[in-house]
Protein backbone atom coordinates (compact mmCIF):
# COMPACT_ATOMS: atom_id res chain seq x y z
CA UNK A 1 0.00 0.00 0.00
CA UNK A 2 1.47 3.33 -1.04
CA UNK A 3 1.21 6.29 1.30
CA UNK A 4 1.81 9.91 0.49
CA UNK A 5 2.45 12.14 3.47
CA UNK A 6 3.07 15.86 3.62
CA UNK A 7 4.22 17.42 6.86
CA UNK A 8 4.00 21.20 6.96
CA UNK A 9 5.52 23.14 9.84
CA UNK A 10 5.63 26.90 9.52
CA UNK A 11 6.46 29.96 11.61
CA UNK A 12 4.77 33.03 10.16
CA UNK A 13 6.54 36.12 11.36
CA UNK A 14 3.81 38.30 12.72
CA UNK A 15 1.71 35.64 14.40
CA UNK A 16 4.55 33.80 16.11
CA UNK A 17 6.09 37.04 17.38
CA UNK A 18 9.55 35.79 16.75
CA UNK A 19 11.13 39.26 16.47
CA UNK A 20 14.15 39.63 18.72
CA UNK A 21 14.70 41.64 21.86
CA UNK A 22 18.13 42.73 22.93
CA UNK A 23 19.80 41.00 25.85
CA UNK A 24 21.66 44.11 26.89
CA UNK A 25 20.37 47.22 28.63
CA UNK A 26 23.13 49.69 27.83
CA UNK A 27 23.90 48.64 24.27
CA UNK A 28 21.46 46.84 22.03
CA UNK A 29 23.19 44.17 20.00
CA UNK A 30 20.13 42.66 18.35
CA UNK A 31 17.35 44.05 16.17
CA UNK A 32 14.46 45.83 17.80
CA UNK A 33 11.17 44.11 18.38
CA UNK A 34 8.24 45.13 16.21
CA UNK A 35 5.08 45.77 18.14
CA UNK A 36 2.48 43.87 16.14
CA UNK A 37 0.12 43.06 19.00
CA UNK A 38 -2.67 45.12 17.47
CA UNK A 39 -3.02 42.70 14.56
CA UNK A 40 -5.33 40.52 16.62
CA UNK A 41 -7.29 43.35 18.28
CA UNK A 42 -10.89 44.14 17.44
CA UNK A 43 -11.94 46.88 15.07
CA UNK A 44 -12.03 50.25 16.84
CA UNK A 45 -14.17 53.04 15.41
CA UNK A 46 -12.59 55.59 17.76
CA UNK A 47 -9.14 54.93 16.32
CA UNK A 48 -10.43 55.25 12.76
CA UNK A 49 -12.24 58.46 13.63
CA UNK A 50 -9.04 59.97 15.00
CA UNK A 51 -7.20 58.98 11.83
CA UNK A 52 -9.83 60.64 9.66
CA UNK A 53 -9.68 63.84 11.70
CA UNK A 54 -5.87 63.81 11.53
CA UNK A 55 -5.95 63.51 7.75
CA UNK A 56 -8.59 66.24 7.39
CA UNK A 57 -6.37 68.66 9.29
CA UNK A 58 -3.90 68.48 6.43
CA UNK A 59 -4.58 70.04 3.08
CA UNK A 60 -4.06 67.26 0.53
CA UNK A 61 -3.48 69.52 -2.47
CA UNK A 62 -1.03 71.69 -0.56
CA UNK A 63 0.87 68.63 0.70
CA UNK A 64 1.13 67.11 -2.77
CA UNK A 65 2.27 70.45 -4.18
CA UNK A 66 5.01 70.65 -1.58
CA UNK A 67 6.02 67.07 -2.36
CA UNK A 68 6.25 67.76 -6.12
CA UNK A 69 8.10 71.03 -5.52
CA UNK A 70 10.65 69.22 -3.39
CA UNK A 71 11.59 66.74 -6.12
CA UNK A 72 11.52 69.30 -8.90
CA UNK A 73 13.82 71.63 -6.98
CA UNK A 74 16.37 68.90 -6.32
CA UNK A 75 15.69 68.51 -2.60
CA UNK A 76 18.22 70.94 -1.10
CA UNK A 77 19.00 70.81 2.61
CA UNK A 78 17.54 74.09 3.86
CA UNK A 79 15.06 74.97 6.56
CA UNK A 80 12.20 75.31 4.09
CA UNK A 81 12.69 71.82 2.71
CA UNK A 82 12.97 70.44 6.24
CA UNK A 83 9.55 71.86 7.05
CA UNK A 84 8.25 70.34 3.80
CA UNK A 85 9.66 66.95 4.80
CA UNK A 86 8.02 67.15 8.21
CA UNK A 87 4.65 68.03 6.68
CA UNK A 88 4.87 65.27 4.07
CA UNK A 89 6.02 62.60 6.53
CA UNK A 90 3.26 63.50 8.97
CA UNK A 91 0.65 63.16 6.23
CA UNK A 92 1.99 59.90 4.84
CA UNK A 93 2.19 58.43 8.33
CA UNK A 94 -1.56 58.86 8.65
CA UNK A 95 -2.07 57.38 5.19
CA UNK A 96 -0.01 54.31 6.14
CA UNK A 97 -2.13 53.77 9.25
CA UNK A 98 -5.30 53.93 7.17
CA UNK A 99 -3.89 51.44 4.65
CA UNK A 100 -2.93 49.07 7.45
CA UNK A 101 -6.44 49.21 8.91
CA UNK A 102 -8.14 48.59 5.57
CA UNK A 103 -5.82 45.75 4.55
CA UNK A 104 -6.21 44.05 7.93
CA UNK A 105 -9.99 44.08 7.61
CA UNK A 106 -9.95 42.72 4.06
CA UNK A 107 -7.18 40.13 4.34
CA UNK A 108 -6.68 39.16 7.98
CA UNK A 109 -9.76 36.98 8.48
CA UNK A 110 -9.19 34.61 5.51
CA UNK A 111 -5.50 34.51 6.37
CA UNK A 112 -6.27 33.40 9.93
CA UNK A 113 -8.66 30.73 8.67
CA UNK A 114 -6.03 29.24 6.35
CA UNK A 115 -3.14 29.57 8.78
CA UNK A 116 -4.47 26.71 10.92
CA UNK A 117 -3.52 24.24 8.20
CA UNK A 118 0.02 25.62 8.11
CA UNK A 119 0.35 24.77 11.80
CA UNK A 120 2.42 27.58 13.31
CA UNK A 121 3.80 27.67 16.85
CA UNK A 122 5.16 30.42 19.06
CA UNK A 123 7.91 28.19 20.42
CA UNK A 124 11.12 28.13 18.41
CA UNK A 125 12.22 24.80 19.89
CA UNK A 126 9.02 23.08 18.74
CA UNK A 127 10.53 22.84 15.28
CA UNK A 128 13.44 20.62 16.33
CA UNK A 129 11.45 17.57 17.61
CA UNK A 130 9.68 17.47 14.26
CA UNK A 131 13.02 17.61 12.43
CA UNK A 132 14.41 14.82 14.62
CA UNK A 133 11.49 12.54 13.77
CA UNK A 134 11.29 13.18 10.02
CA UNK A 135 14.52 14.72 8.71
CA UNK A 136 16.80 11.88 9.81
CA UNK A 137 15.25 9.51 7.23
CA UNK A 138 15.56 11.86 4.27
CA UNK A 139 18.31 11.63 1.67
CA UNK A 140 18.57 15.26 0.59
CA UNK A 141 17.91 18.72 2.00
CA UNK A 142 17.35 21.99 0.19
CA UNK A 143 18.22 25.19 2.00
CA UNK A 144 16.29 28.12 0.49
CA UNK A 145 16.53 31.84 1.20
CA UNK A 146 13.51 34.04 0.53
CA UNK A 147 14.58 37.47 -0.79
CA UNK A 148 14.34 40.26 1.76
CA UNK A 149 13.49 43.02 -0.69
CA UNK A 150 10.07 42.97 -2.32
CA UNK A 151 9.43 45.10 -5.36
CA UNK A 152 6.38 47.34 -4.81
CA UNK A 153 4.73 46.21 -8.04
CA UNK A 154 4.72 42.58 -6.85
CA UNK A 155 2.66 43.43 -3.78
CA UNK A 156 0.32 45.60 -5.82
CA UNK A 157 -0.35 42.71 -8.22
CA UNK A 158 -1.01 40.39 -5.28
CA UNK A 159 -3.54 42.78 -3.74
CA UNK A 160 -5.23 43.40 -7.08
CA UNK A 161 -6.28 39.74 -7.12
CA UNK A 162 -8.31 40.38 -3.96
CA UNK A 163 -9.26 44.07 -4.18
CA UNK A 164 -10.97 45.27 -7.35
CA UNK A 165 -11.02 48.96 -6.41
CA UNK A 166 -8.73 50.79 -8.87
CA UNK A 167 -8.26 54.03 -6.84
CA UNK A 168 -7.18 52.00 -3.83
CA UNK A 169 -4.58 50.20 -5.95
CA UNK A 170 -3.25 53.55 -7.16
CA UNK A 171 -3.01 54.74 -3.56
CA UNK A 172 -1.06 51.59 -2.66
CA UNK A 173 1.32 52.18 -5.56
CA UNK A 174 1.80 55.81 -4.52
CA UNK A 175 2.67 54.91 -0.91
CA UNK A 176 4.85 51.89 -1.76
CA UNK A 177 6.98 53.81 -4.22
CA UNK A 178 7.35 56.73 -1.83
CA UNK A 179 8.42 54.53 1.12
CA UNK A 180 10.20 51.54 -0.38
CA UNK A 181 12.07 50.93 2.87
CA UNK A 182 8.83 49.62 4.36
CA UNK A 183 9.09 46.55 2.15
CA UNK A 184 12.73 45.79 3.01
CA UNK A 185 12.27 42.96 5.48
CA UNK A 186 15.86 42.73 6.71
CA UNK A 187 15.64 43.93 10.31
CA UNK A 188 19.40 44.31 10.58
CA UNK A 189 19.22 47.30 8.19
CA UNK A 190 19.04 50.48 10.32
CA UNK A 191 15.58 51.96 9.78
CA UNK A 192 13.58 54.46 11.76
CA UNK A 193 10.67 53.47 13.98
CA UNK A 194 8.23 55.06 11.55
CA UNK A 195 9.46 52.88 8.70
CA UNK A 196 9.39 49.67 10.78
CA UNK A 197 5.65 49.74 11.27
CA UNK A 198 2.64 47.48 11.43
CA UNK A 199 2.28 47.84 7.69
CA UNK A 200 5.67 46.24 7.02
CA UNK A 201 4.83 43.36 9.35
CA UNK A 202 1.52 42.79 7.63
CA UNK A 203 3.06 42.97 4.16
CA UNK A 204 5.69 40.38 5.11
CA UNK A 205 3.07 38.01 6.51
CA UNK A 206 0.84 38.30 3.49
CA UNK A 207 3.72 38.03 1.04
CA UNK A 208 4.98 34.76 2.55
CA UNK A 209 1.44 33.46 2.99
CA UNK A 210 0.76 33.87 -0.72
CA UNK A 211 3.92 31.94 -1.55
CA UNK A 212 3.20 29.09 0.87
CA UNK A 213 -0.51 28.71 0.17
CA UNK A 214 0.04 28.62 -3.60
CA UNK A 215 2.92 26.16 -3.29
CA UNK A 216 0.96 23.82 -1.01
CA UNK A 217 -2.11 23.89 -3.25
CA UNK A 218 0.02 22.98 -6.28
CA UNK A 219 1.64 20.13 -4.36
CA UNK A 220 -1.75 18.77 -3.36
CA UNK A 221 -3.20 18.95 -6.86
CA UNK A 222 -0.13 17.49 -8.54
CA UNK A 223 0.89 14.72 -6.13
CA UNK A 224 -2.38 14.24 -4.19
CA UNK A 225 -0.62 15.03 -0.94
CA UNK A 226 -2.66 14.82 2.25
CA UNK A 227 -1.16 17.29 4.67
CA UNK A 228 -1.43 16.67 8.37
CA UNK A 229 -0.16 18.97 11.12
CA UNK A 230 2.62 18.12 13.51
CA UNK A 231 1.07 19.09 16.84
CA UNK A 232 2.68 19.62 20.20
CA UNK A 233 1.07 20.21 23.58
CA UNK A 234 3.13 23.13 24.81
CA UNK A 235 3.85 21.98 28.32
CA UNK A 236 6.87 23.78 29.69
CA UNK A 237 9.35 20.93 29.54
CA UNK A 238 7.57 18.18 27.63
CA UNK A 239 6.45 17.62 24.08
CA UNK A 240 3.56 15.23 23.41
CA UNK A 241 3.24 14.78 19.67
CA UNK A 242 0.00 14.00 17.91
CA UNK A 243 -0.79 13.09 14.31
CA UNK A 244 -4.13 13.87 12.74
CA UNK A 245 -5.89 13.18 9.46
CA UNK A 246 -3.77 10.35 8.08
CA UNK A 247 -5.29 8.93 4.95
CA UNK A 248 -4.11 5.93 2.95
CA UNK A 249 -4.02 6.24 -0.80
CA UNK A 250 -4.63 3.37 -3.23
CA UNK A 251 -1.90 1.92 -5.40
CA UNK A 252 -0.57 4.18 -8.10
CA UNK A 253 -1.29 3.22 -11.64
CA UNK A 254 1.45 2.74 -14.15
CA UNK A 255 0.56 5.71 -16.37
CA UNK A 256 0.82 8.82 -14.13
CA UNK A 257 3.95 10.90 -14.56
CA UNK A 258 5.24 14.13 -13.05
CA UNK A 259 4.65 16.77 -15.68
CA UNK A 260 5.29 19.88 -13.63
CA UNK A 261 8.94 18.93 -13.09
CA UNK A 262 9.60 18.94 -16.84
CA UNK A 263 10.71 15.33 -16.79
CA UNK A 264 9.28 11.87 -17.30
CA UNK A 265 9.64 10.35 -13.85
CA UNK A 266 7.19 7.51 -13.21
CA UNK A 267 5.82 7.31 -9.69
CA UNK A 268 6.77 3.98 -8.13
CA UNK A 269 4.99 2.30 -5.27
CA UNK A 270 6.97 3.96 -2.49
CA UNK A 271 6.42 6.16 0.53
CA UNK A 272 6.86 9.71 -0.73
CA UNK A 273 6.99 12.55 1.75
CA UNK A 274 8.02 16.17 1.66
CA UNK A 275 8.85 18.03 4.85
CA UNK A 276 8.76 21.80 4.75
CA UNK A 277 10.05 24.01 7.58
CA UNK A 278 10.35 27.79 7.61
CA UNK A 279 11.51 30.43 10.06
CA UNK A 280 11.37 34.04 8.80
CA UNK A 281 13.03 33.98 5.37
CA UNK A 282 14.92 30.69 5.90
CA UNK A 283 13.13 27.55 4.77
CA UNK A 284 14.17 23.94 4.28
CA UNK A 285 12.67 21.14 2.23
CA UNK A 286 13.65 17.56 3.02
CA UNK A 287 12.79 14.78 0.59
CA UNK A 288 13.75 11.24 -0.26
CA UNK A 289 15.05 10.43 -3.70
CA UNK A 290 17.95 10.68 -6.11
CA UNK A 291 20.07 13.71 -7.01
CA UNK A 292 18.19 14.02 -10.28
CA UNK A 293 14.90 14.41 -8.44
CA UNK A 294 16.41 16.99 -6.07
CA UNK A 295 17.71 19.13 -8.93
CA UNK A 296 14.29 18.88 -10.57
CA UNK A 297 12.76 20.26 -7.38
CA UNK A 298 15.28 23.10 -7.43
CA UNK A 299 14.29 24.04 -10.98
CA UNK A 300 10.63 23.74 -10.04
CA UNK A 301 10.92 26.18 -7.11
CA UNK A 302 12.92 28.71 -9.15
CA UNK A 303 10.45 28.62 -12.05
CA UNK A 304 7.49 28.76 -9.70
CA UNK A 305 8.88 31.87 -8.03
CA UNK A 306 9.64 33.60 -11.33
CA UNK A 307 6.24 32.76 -12.80
CA UNK A 308 4.12 33.67 -9.78
CA UNK A 309 5.98 36.74 -8.49
CA UNK A 310 7.37 37.94 -11.84
CA UNK A 311 10.87 38.48 -10.48
CA UNK A 312 14.27 36.88 -10.89
CA UNK A 313 15.11 34.27 -8.26
CA UNK A 314 18.84 33.59 -8.01
CA UNK A 315 19.69 29.87 -8.29
CA UNK A 316 22.28 30.27 -5.51
CA UNK A 317 19.43 30.82 -3.05
CA UNK A 318 18.50 27.13 -3.39
CA UNK A 319 21.34 24.90 -2.22
CA UNK A 320 20.60 21.13 -2.28
CA UNK A 321 22.71 19.01 0.05
CA UNK A 322 23.11 15.31 0.69
CA UNK A 323 22.24 14.39 4.26
CA UNK A 324 24.84 11.61 4.59
CA UNK A 325 27.75 13.93 3.75
CA UNK A 326 26.91 17.56 4.43
CA UNK A 327 25.42 19.36 7.42
CA UNK A 328 22.84 22.11 7.67
CA UNK A 329 23.00 25.43 9.50
CA UNK A 330 19.60 26.40 10.86
CA UNK A 331 18.68 28.80 13.68
CA UNK A 332 22.24 28.92 15.00
CA UNK A 333 22.60 25.12 15.17
CA UNK A 334 24.71 22.84 13.00
CA UNK A 335 22.51 19.87 12.08
CA UNK A 336 23.97 16.59 10.91
CA UNK A 337 23.12 12.89 10.83
CA UNK A 338 25.08 10.15 12.59
CA UNK A 339 24.40 6.42 13.06
CA UNK A 340 22.68 5.43 16.30
CA UNK A 341 23.03 1.98 17.87
CA UNK A 342 20.03 0.47 19.68
CA UNK A 343 20.51 -2.78 21.60
CA UNK A 344 17.62 -5.23 21.18
CA UNK A 345 17.08 -8.40 23.25
CA UNK A 346 14.85 -11.03 21.66
CA UNK A 347 13.18 -13.06 24.42
CA UNK A 348 13.32 -16.83 23.71
CA UNK A 349 12.98 -20.04 25.72
CA UNK A 350 16.56 -20.65 26.85
CA UNK A 351 18.51 -17.44 26.47
CA UNK A 352 18.26 -13.83 25.41
CA UNK A 353 20.31 -13.24 22.27
CA UNK A 354 21.42 -9.64 22.00
CA UNK A 355 21.50 -7.87 18.69
CA UNK A 356 21.87 -4.27 17.65
CA UNK A 357 19.96 -2.10 15.22
CA UNK A 358 21.69 0.78 13.50
CA UNK A 359 19.45 3.73 12.75
CA UNK A 360 20.00 7.38 11.88
CA UNK A 361 19.83 10.24 14.34
CA UNK A 362 19.65 13.97 13.70
CA UNK A 363 22.30 15.66 15.84
CA UNK A 364 22.45 19.33 16.73
CA UNK A 365 25.65 20.97 17.97
CA UNK A 366 26.57 24.52 18.88
CA UNK A 367 29.23 26.18 16.67
CA UNK A 368 31.74 26.95 19.41
CA UNK A 369 34.43 28.48 17.21
CA UNK A 370 32.03 30.91 15.53
CA UNK A 371 30.34 31.75 18.83
CA UNK A 372 33.69 32.74 20.33
CA UNK A 373 34.28 34.96 17.30
CA UNK A 374 31.02 36.76 18.02
CA UNK A 375 31.91 37.18 21.69
CA UNK A 376 35.30 38.58 20.66
CA UNK A 377 33.57 41.05 18.36
CA UNK A 378 31.45 42.25 21.30
CA UNK A 379 34.59 42.62 23.49
CA UNK A 380 33.88 39.76 25.91
CA UNK A 381 37.12 37.98 24.96
CA UNK A 382 39.97 38.20 22.50
CA UNK A 383 40.31 36.25 19.26
CA UNK A 384 41.94 33.33 21.11
CA UNK A 385 38.99 32.98 23.51
CA UNK A 386 40.68 34.51 26.58
CA UNK A 387 38.17 36.52 28.66
CA UNK A 388 38.60 40.28 28.93
CA UNK A 389 36.70 42.93 30.86
CA UNK A 390 33.72 44.71 29.33
CA UNK A 391 34.94 48.29 29.73
CA UNK A 392 31.71 49.82 28.43
CA UNK A 393 29.81 48.37 31.41
CA UNK A 394 32.14 49.65 34.15
CA UNK A 395 29.91 52.70 34.63
CA UNK A 396 26.98 50.51 35.72
CA UNK A 397 26.17 49.62 39.29
CA UNK A 398 27.67 46.57 40.97
CA UNK A 399 24.39 44.64 40.89
CA UNK A 400 23.62 45.48 37.26
CA UNK A 401 26.88 44.08 35.86
CA UNK A 402 26.38 40.47 37.10
CA UNK A 403 22.69 40.62 36.16
CA UNK A 404 23.54 41.51 32.57
CA UNK A 405 26.09 38.69 32.27
CA UNK A 406 23.70 36.22 33.92
CA UNK A 407 20.93 37.24 31.55
CA UNK A 408 23.17 36.62 28.54
CA UNK A 409 24.32 33.21 29.77
CA UNK A 410 20.84 32.12 30.81
CA UNK A 411 19.43 32.79 27.34
CA UNK A 412 22.38 31.08 25.64
CA UNK A 413 22.14 28.01 27.87
CA UNK A 414 18.40 27.47 27.48
CA UNK A 415 18.46 28.14 23.74
CA UNK A 416 21.28 25.65 23.11
CA UNK A 417 19.91 23.07 25.56
CA UNK A 418 19.39 20.61 22.71
CA UNK A 419 23.03 20.50 21.62
CA UNK A 420 25.13 17.38 22.18
CA UNK A 421 28.53 19.06 22.62
CA UNK A 422 28.02 20.42 26.14
CA UNK A 423 31.75 21.07 26.58
CA UNK A 424 31.58 23.86 24.04
CA UNK A 425 28.59 25.33 25.85
CA UNK A 426 30.50 25.43 29.14
CA UNK A 427 33.43 27.05 27.36
CA UNK A 428 31.17 30.00 26.58
CA UNK A 429 30.12 30.01 30.25
CA UNK A 430 33.78 30.22 31.28
CA UNK A 431 34.33 33.25 29.02
CA UNK A 432 31.29 35.11 30.36
CA UNK A 433 32.06 34.22 33.98
CA UNK A 434 35.61 35.57 33.96
CA UNK A 435 34.64 38.53 31.79
CA UNK A 436 32.12 39.50 34.49
CA UNK A 437 34.77 39.18 37.21
CA UNK A 438 37.31 41.21 35.22
CA UNK A 439 34.73 43.92 34.57
CA UNK A 440 34.07 44.31 38.31
CA UNK A 441 37.79 44.18 39.05
CA UNK A 442 38.45 46.91 36.48
CA UNK A 443 35.71 49.08 37.95
CA UNK A 444 37.05 48.85 41.53
CA UNK A 445 40.71 48.72 40.42
CA UNK A 446 41.30 45.40 42.16
CA UNK A 447 41.99 41.79 41.19
CA UNK A 448 39.76 38.85 40.33
CA UNK A 449 40.62 37.13 43.63
CA UNK A 450 39.27 40.10 45.57
CA UNK A 451 36.07 40.02 43.52
CA UNK A 452 35.57 36.28 44.22
CA UNK A 453 36.04 36.84 47.95
CA UNK A 454 33.71 39.82 48.05
CA UNK A 455 30.82 38.48 45.99
CA UNK A 456 31.35 34.73 45.85
CA UNK A 457 31.61 32.82 42.61
CA UNK A 458 28.22 31.09 42.86
CA UNK A 459 26.31 34.18 43.93
CA UNK A 460 28.04 36.32 41.33
CA UNK A 461 27.52 33.93 38.44
CA UNK A 462 25.07 31.09 39.27
CA UNK A 463 25.05 27.92 37.22
CA UNK A 464 22.06 26.70 35.27
CA UNK A 465 23.36 23.23 34.51
CA UNK A 466 21.24 21.51 37.18
CA UNK A 467 17.89 22.37 35.52
CA UNK A 468 16.51 23.43 38.89
CA UNK A 469 14.41 26.24 37.47
CA UNK A 470 12.83 24.30 34.63
CA UNK A 471 12.95 20.72 35.82
CA UNK A 472 9.76 18.84 35.07
CA UNK A 473 7.95 17.04 37.92
CA UNK A 474 7.31 14.11 35.56
CA UNK A 475 10.98 13.47 34.74
CA UNK A 476 13.82 12.45 36.99
CA UNK A 477 16.96 14.52 37.39
CA UNK A 478 19.08 11.76 35.82
CA UNK A 479 17.02 11.97 32.65
CA UNK A 480 17.36 15.75 32.47
CA UNK A 481 21.13 15.50 32.82
CA UNK A 482 21.81 12.83 30.18
CA UNK A 483 19.20 13.64 27.56
CA UNK A 484 19.07 16.73 25.44
CA UNK A 485 16.18 19.01 26.15
CA UNK A 486 14.03 21.21 23.95
CA UNK A 487 12.30 23.92 25.96
CA UNK A 488 8.97 24.73 24.35
CA UNK A 489 8.69 28.05 26.18
CA UNK A 490 11.64 29.55 24.28
CA UNK A 491 10.00 32.06 21.94
CA UNK A 492 12.98 34.30 21.09
CA UNK A 493 16.11 33.60 19.11
CA UNK A 494 19.37 33.92 21.00
CA UNK A 495 21.75 36.73 20.06
CA UNK A 496 24.47 34.32 18.92
CA UNK A 497 22.02 32.26 16.88
CA UNK A 498 20.55 35.34 15.25
CA UNK A 499 23.98 36.71 14.32
CA UNK A 500 25.01 33.38 12.78
CA UNK A 501 21.72 33.08 10.92
CA UNK A 502 22.04 36.59 9.49
CA UNK A 503 25.49 35.75 8.12
CA UNK A 504 27.52 38.15 10.26
CA UNK A 505 30.19 35.44 10.42
CA UNK A 506 30.69 34.40 6.75
CA UNK A 507 32.64 31.25 7.65
CA UNK A 508 29.52 29.83 9.33
CA UNK A 509 27.81 29.32 5.97
CA UNK A 510 30.59 27.13 4.58
CA UNK A 511 30.06 23.42 4.08
CA UNK A 512 30.41 21.38 7.26
CA UNK A 513 30.71 17.62 6.78
CA UNK A 514 29.22 14.91 8.95
CA UNK A 515 32.68 13.49 9.69
CA UNK A 516 33.73 16.70 11.42
CA UNK A 517 30.44 16.78 13.30
CA UNK A 518 30.82 13.22 14.63
CA UNK A 519 34.31 14.07 15.96
CA UNK A 520 32.83 16.84 18.11
CA UNK A 521 30.11 14.62 19.56
CA UNK A 522 30.56 12.49 22.69
CA UNK A 523 30.77 8.74 22.26
CA UNK A 524 27.66 6.65 22.61
CA UNK A 525 28.46 4.89 25.84
CA UNK A 526 24.91 4.12 26.90
CA UNK A 527 22.59 2.34 24.49
CA UNK A 528 18.86 2.07 24.62
CA UNK A 529 17.77 -1.51 25.28
CA UNK A 530 14.48 -2.91 24.06
CA UNK A 531 13.17 -6.38 25.00
CA UNK A 532 11.02 -8.06 22.38
UniProtKB/Swiss-Prot annotation:
Pfam families in the cross-refs: Intron_maturas2, MatK_N
Any Gene Ontology biological process: RNA splicing
Cellular localization per UniProt: Plastid, Chloroplast
Matches recorded under InterPro entries: Domain_X, Maturase_MatK, Maturase_MatK_N
Gene Ontology molecular function: RNA binding
Main location: plastid
Gene Ontology cellular-component annotations: chloroplast
Record's keyword terms, sorted: Chloroplast, mRNA processing, Plastid, RNA-binding, tRNA processing
Entry function: Usually encoded in the trnK tRNA gene intron. Probably assists in splicing its own and other chloroplast group II introns.
Family to which this protein belongs: Belongs to the intron maturase 2 family. MatK subfamily.
PANTHER family, per the entry: MATURASE K (PTHR34811:SF1)
Protein name as it appears in the record: Maturase K
Species whose genome carries this gene: Huperzia lucidula (Shining clubmoss)
Name of the coding gene: matK
Amino acid sequence: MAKTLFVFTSFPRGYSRNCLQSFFKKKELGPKKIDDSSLNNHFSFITRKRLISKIRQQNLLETLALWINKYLSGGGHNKKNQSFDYCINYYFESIREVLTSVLQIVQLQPLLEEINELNSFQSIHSIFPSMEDHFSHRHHFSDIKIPYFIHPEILIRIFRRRIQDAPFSHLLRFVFYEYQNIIVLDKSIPLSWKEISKLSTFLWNYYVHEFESTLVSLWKRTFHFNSFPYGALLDRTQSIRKVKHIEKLPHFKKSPRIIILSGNIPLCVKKYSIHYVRYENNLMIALKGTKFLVHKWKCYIIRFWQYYFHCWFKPCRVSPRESSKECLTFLGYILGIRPQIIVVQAKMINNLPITSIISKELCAIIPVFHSIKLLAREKFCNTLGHPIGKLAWTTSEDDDIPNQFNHIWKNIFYYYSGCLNRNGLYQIQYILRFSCAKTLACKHKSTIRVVWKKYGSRRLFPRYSSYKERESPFLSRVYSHKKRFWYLDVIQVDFIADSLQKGRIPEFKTNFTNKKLIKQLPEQTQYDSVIL
